Structures are given as C-alpha cells and as structure tokens.
Amino acid sequence: MIQKRISKYISRFLASSLLALLPLGAYAQTPRLLPEVKDTTALFRGVAVSADVVGLIQMAVSSYGQYEAAMRVNLKDKYFPVIELGLGKANAEDAATQLSYKTTAPYGRVGLDLNLMKNKHDINRLYGGLRYAYTSYKFDLSSPGITDPNWGGTAEFNAKDVEGNYHWLEFVAGVDAKIWGPIRLGWSVRYKRRLAHDDGFVGNAWYVPGYGKSGNTRLGGTFNVIFELGGAKQPKKKGEKNDK
C-alpha cells in the first residue's frame, strides 16, 4: 500500500516537472527577432577636389600628357558621383617617318564610384567604378617630305585642324587614404574601352586627349592629391554625447 502511494507521488512529480519544462523548451526554440537597425547616415557627407599627378609626369618626360582635375561628391559614404575635366596635349615627331603630330584639346568624364569597404565609414576607401568619357579635338599632321614609291620625287604633306572625336568607357578600381586633416592620396587603375570615334580623313590619330595613344583598348592609371571637406568620420550612435 505504501509502495503504491510512493509510486503515485513520484508519477505526479514527474508529470508536473515535464509540464513545467514544456514552455521553456518552446521559448528556447523560438528565434529572437532583433530590431532592424536604421541607417542614420546623412545623404550628403562631403565633397572632394583632386588633381592628377600622372599626367604632369607624362608632360615632363614624354611628348604628350594632360592636366586633369576632378570633383567627387560623398553620398552616405557609399556612393561617389564623379566629374573629371582635363586638357590633353601632344607635340610629337616620329624619327623614322618624320611625321609630326600636334594637338591640344579638353576632355571630360562623368561616372560613379562605389565604396567596397565592409565598414563604409572607414577613413580609407576601396573603390570600384565606371566612367563615360568624351573629347572633341583638332590636330595637325605634317611631314617635310613623302617620297612617291612609284614615280619618285618628294612632296610635302600638311594636314591642319583635322577634326576628330572619341567616346569611351573606363572601368575603374582604386584606393584612397587619409594622410592628414583634409588631405588624402588616391590611386586608380583604369581599363579603357573605345565606343565610337572619328579620326578625320587622315586615319587614326596618334594621340587622343584624355584617352592616350589611339587603339581599341588600353590600360591607364591616376595618382591623385585630394582635398576633402566632410566625410570620413564615424557617425555618432544614438544617445552618444558630443565631445567637449
């Protein structure tokens, strides 16, 4: 009789314990829903102006090059619309053919860079981007004398103010780093793809302002000194006090 009562009490205790554990198990299996964190970064985060050094070096050590400056807008530390303007120049002579080529003309590019860093507010940035570029230019082509292979004799050749234009795309990969205060340095590598062109009646132009030596595709690069106003600062978290 006593054993039956003990067994009855043990059964009730086990049943009560199982019933008490059931809600805990159900709660443990329910995933916790975390509140969605809103992006409180301001849309406009700053603007930067820059100048390319590579073109200046080309002008100093070769017969062609360019002066180039750019302006870049910072949107949410993620998107960077860019406009690039420059002046391309060439004054070259081929030693073998004695052909001289000369041009000076402006060019422009517009496009967008994306910040590829995991932490988009980092003071250093990794970019991927795209540019559309265009130039309309005139060039002079001359030679002191061209020998006729059939009849012999030499005739001068001069073509002045030959009109041409180029449309092309540039695929961009680059980095820039904060040096001090608003001063930054940036590097980019560019793959250029010609879309459409008109070289005038004399054939392919030797040099195209902004594009470089003519051809279907080419690689290029820039090294920029950048002055940036705004951006590159971690946004304050909600409830964080300002520094005194």
Q: Predicted segments — roles?
A:
Residues 1-40, 230-244:
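Cleavable N-terminal export/targeting peptides
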Residues 79, 84-151, 227:
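Gram-negative (and chloroplast) outer-membrane scaffold detector with strong preference
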Residues 33-45, 78, 117-125, 179-185, ...:
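Short loop/turn motifs that connect adjacent beta-strands in outer-membrane beta-barrel proteins
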Residues 27-74, 224-235:
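Short glycine/proline- and aromatic-enriched beta-strand/turn motifs that initiate or cap beta-hairpins
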Residues 51, 69-71, 81-85, 112, ...:
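Membrane-embedded beta-strands that build the outer-membrane beta-barrel scaffold
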Residues 127, 131-220, 224-234:
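Outer-membrane beta-barrel transmembrane domain signature
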Residues 45, 63-67, 102-108, 124, ...:
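Residues that define the transmembrane beta-barrel architecture of outer-membrane proteins
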